[in-house]
Amino acid sequence: MRAILIGIFFLTCGAVQISKAEPVALRDVIKTYANIAEAAYSDAHVTAQKLQVAVNMLIANPTPKSLATARQAWIAARVPYQQTEVFRFGNPIVENWEGKVNAWPLDEGLIDYVQGDYGTASDENQLYAANVIANTSLKIGGRSVDASKLTKEFLAKTLHEADGIESNVATGYHAIEFLLWGQDLNGTGKG
């Protein structure tokens, strides 16, 4: 019986017709790529706006509930944003701004206080433990900078990647993650 079934299987395999794929125009491929990218970035934008609303609510009314809501909004926003990562490779338009949204790793001490074993200084980064939240003035590039107002412009143009150091991350998902959950105390060993 088994031999008969195997024989029938192989006989029917030969009867299966395989058709060739139809040629596709390059403009159709590009249009499909653009449509998929637009949908992905649209989803990421919508969830980022919801995250902004949740963070604004947390700032206006800092409670355990508003913190939990902001954390959930961050998690919900990360998934669609991560799905856009495929579009950044080889795309200079995306590469130009992506570091302001998704830069990693970050020196957490730039933003806020950290555990004592984090250290207070770094040979590579003078802002390693600057704690911009607690300090109204910072020294960046050898000059004193007013840090009393943490505006979008200050964060994006002065603090983010200050002194040309990529780990000086002041904007984006990972900076928000640090502010919502605090310092990552899980170590730096193998995962």
Predicted feature locations:
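Positively charged n-region of N-terminal signal peptides that target proteins for export
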Residues: M1-I4
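Bacterial N-terminal signal peptides
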Residues: I6-G14
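Sec/Tat signal peptide C-region and signal peptidase I cleavage site
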Residues: A15-A21
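Mature extracytoplasmic or organellar-lumen-exposed domains after removal of signal/transit peptides
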Residues: E22-G191
